[in-house]
C-alpha cells in the first residue's frame, strides 16, 4: 500500500454515543485514541487530515489535530462541508463547536456551493472525500449501526477499485484503550 498523505476521519455523531455534555468522560477516551492513531499516521507521512464538520468524532478530531500541531506543526486540518451553510440550523452550543473547529482548520470549503437541496450533495461529498484521500480512519463498530455506515459502505466499494486504506476503531478498541 502506498503512503497515505491525506486521511479522512469520521465516525459516530455525539448523539449516537449518548453524549450530550462537553464534559462526558467518553469524549476523553475517544480523543485519547484519536491522538494515538493520528500521531501514528502523521509519523508515517500523513500531511492532511480531513473532516466534514459533523458533531461528535469529526469535531473532536479537529480539537485533537489542534493539540497535535504543537508536536507536529506540519500537519494540516481540512474542513470540507458537504454543502454551503452546513450547521446553520444547529443550536448555539453546537454552532460554537463548529466555529472552534473552523478556527483550528488550515483550509475550509464546501463540496457543493449551494445550500442543502438533496441527498445527491451528500453522495458527491462522499465521492470527493474518497477521491481526495488515501484512506479513512473511522470510529465505528458494525455491531452498533450509525450514520457512518453509509460512508463505510461507499469506502469499501471504492477500495475494491482503487488502493484505499480503511481503519476501523471499534467499541472493543475504545474499551481496551481505557485498560491499557
Curated annotation (Swiss-Prot):
Belongs to the UPF0398 family. It comes from Enterococcus faecalis (strain ATCC 700802 / V583). Gene3D superfamilies: 3.40.50.450. This is UPF0398 protein EF_1150. It comes from the Bacteria. InterPro entries: YspA. It holds the Pfam family YpsA. PANTHER family: UPF0398 PROTEIN SPR0331, UPF0398 PROTEIN YPSA.
Amino acid at each position: 500500500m502506498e503512503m497515505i498523505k491525506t486521511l479522512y476521519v469520521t465516525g459516530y455523531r455525539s448523539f449516537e454515543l449518548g453524549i450530550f455534555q462537553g464534559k462526558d468522560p467518553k469524549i476523553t477516551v475517544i480523543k485519547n485514541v484519536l491522538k494515538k492513531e493520528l500521531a501514528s499516521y502523521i509519523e508515517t507521512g500523513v500531511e492532511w487530515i480531513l473532516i466534514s464538520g459533523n458533531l461528535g468524532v469529526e469535531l473532536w478530531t479537529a480539537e485533537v489535530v489542534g493539540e497535535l500541531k504543537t508536536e507536529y506543526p506540519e500537519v494540516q486540518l481540512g474542513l470540507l462541508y458537504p454543502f454551503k451553510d452546513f450547521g446553520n440550523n444547529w443550536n448555539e452550543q453546537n454552532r460554537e463547536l463548529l466555529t472552534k473547529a473552523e478556527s483550528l482548520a488550515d483550509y475550509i470549503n464546501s463540496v457543493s456551493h449551494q445550500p442543502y437541496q438533496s441527498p445527491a450533495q451528500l453522495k458527491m461529498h462522499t465521492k470527493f472525500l474518497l477521491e481526495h484521500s488515501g484512506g479513512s480512519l473511522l470510529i465505528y463498530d458494525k455491531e452498533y449501526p450509525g450514520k457512518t455506515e453509509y460512508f463505510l459502505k461507499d469506502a469499501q466499494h471504492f477500495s475494491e477499485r482503487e488502493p484505499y486504506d480503511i481503519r476501523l476503531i471499534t467499541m472493543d478498541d475504545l474499551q481496551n484503550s481505557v485498560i491499557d
